[in-house]
From Swiss-Prot:
Quaternary state and interactors: Heterododecamer (2C3:3R2) of six catalytic PyrB chains organized as two trimers (C3), and six regulatory PyrI chains organized as three dimers (R2).
Domain of life, per lineage: Bacteria
Catalytic activity: carbamoyl phosphate + L-aspartate = N-carbamoyl-L-aspartate + phosphate + H(+)
Entry keyword set: Pyrimidine biosynthesis, Transferase
EC number: 2.1.3.2
Family of the protein in this entry: Belongs to the aspartate/ornithine carbamoyltransferase superfamily. ATCase family.
Example GO molecular function: aspartate carbamoyltransferase activity
UniProt name for this protein: Aspartate carbamoyltransferase catalytic subunit
Cited PROSITE patterns: CARBAMOYLTRANSFERASE
GO cellular component, one term: cytosol
InterPro entries: Asp/Orn_carbamoyltranf_P-bd, Asp/Orn_carbamoylTrfase, Asp/Orn_carbamoylTrfase_sf, Asp_carbamoyltransf, Asp_carbamoyltransf_Asp/Orn-bd
């Protein structure tokens, strides 16, 4: 594939291909030497115009496990803070021979802009743009759900979709790029998605999204869910009051201890609790819920490296076959020079 900009761009075939490749990549983390020579000699640039810890480190770990060279670029303290444009920055990176650019930007659409221009001849991965999308987060979430879904059914996760899985995504949907990417990807994979939020934290036009909408978390849980994903309340993006108080928000839309107990009383022993991180403990999720056996928070972080390894590998390996993902662990020593669309 040439770029990874949006989950809306992914067909069912391509989404499963990335997830299946990630399954193979996950085996690398269990080896004594956690490295493959697949991208040796390639340069991956992490171009971050917004602060990030887990996403940047995850991409860095993914690239290094594939033996790529990594350049970390932060806007703070760089020429960008002195007024350098995205175009000038991209052309500078091109002159340095970047093969892939992982970009996080405060402006929605910035990764698409970079990919659509001739400023740089490199693959572009969207690591989060404004409130628009965060495709690799959605992919790692789907990877985590698919493993859980396969475990329950006693079948291999490779090649599987999420048909029939019921997923609730609750919280600050308005400011969440994670919610947007998850809605599109999960529907592509066959899951049934319900967004749960106060009316003030739902975007205009949400009724046109391929999902159901609810204002009541308890009612949604009572109808039955296989996974509930809590979204962080993004206070840094709020310039007005979107709910009466943090206490009221937690009581009505947070996953607190009472709702954790309710899963047991409702007979939902296999329901998992997810969070893309970072968490506001005590606000959208209680400490007990975050640390419970149902929580997949740490699994999501771990799976993120595998998914990002898969994305980088498919972006830079030049593999254009329309069949299932190749046996990466056996063939990872060969990485070609072309970058084509899937």
């Amino acid at each position: 594939m040439k770029h990874l900009l949006s989950t809306q761009d992914l067909s069912l075939h391509n989404a499963i291909r990335i997830l299946d490749t990630a399954e193979e990549m996950s085996a690398v983390g269990d080896r004594e030497v956690k490295k493959l020579p697949a991208l040796r000699g390639r340069t991956v640039v992490n171009l971050f115009f917004e602060d990030s810890t887990r996403t940047r480190i995850s991409f860095e770990a993914a690239a290094k496990r594939l033996s790529a060279d990594v350049i970390n670029f932060a806007a703070k303290g760089s020429s960008v803070s002195k007024g350098e444009s995205l175009k000038d920055t991209a052309q500078t990176l091109s002159a340095m021979g970047a093969d892939a650019v992982v970009i996080r930007h405060w402006a929605s659409g910035a990764p698409h802009r970079l990919a659509a221009t001739d400023w740089i001849d490199a693959g572009v991965i969207n690591a989060g743009d404004g409130t628009h999308e965060h495709p690799t987060q959605a992919l790692l979430d789907a990877f985590t759900m698919r493993r859980h879904w396969a475990k329950l059914s006693g079948t291999p996760s490779e090649g599987a979709d999420l048909k029939g899985m019921r997923v609730a995504i609750a919280g600050d949907v308005l400011h969440s790029r994670v919610a947007r990417s998850n809605v599109w990807l999960l529907r592509t994979l066959g899951a049934e998605v319900t967004l749960v939020a106060p009316p003030t934290l739902l975007p205009i036009g949400v009724e046109k999204w391929p999902c159901a909408v609810s204002y009541d978390l308890d009612e949604t849980l009572a109808r039955g869910v296989d996974a509930v994903m809590m979204l962080r309340v993004q206070g840094e993006r709020m310039n007005a009051s979107f709910f009466p108080s943090t206490r009221e928000y937690s009581r009505r839309w947070g996953f607190d201890d009472n709702r954790l107990r309710a899963l047991d009383s409702l007979g939902m022993k296999d329901t998992i609790i997810m969070h893309p991180g970072p968490m506001n403990r005590g606000l959208e999720i209680s400490a007990a819920a975050a640390d419970s056996p149902r929580s997949t928070v740490l699994a999501q972080v771990r799976n993120g490296v595998s998914v990002r390894m898969a994305a980088l590998y498919l972006l830079l390996s030049g593999d254009t076959r329309e069949t299932a993902a190749p046996p990466v662990l056996a063939a990872a020593g060969t990485a070609h020079s072309t970058k084509e669309s899937i």
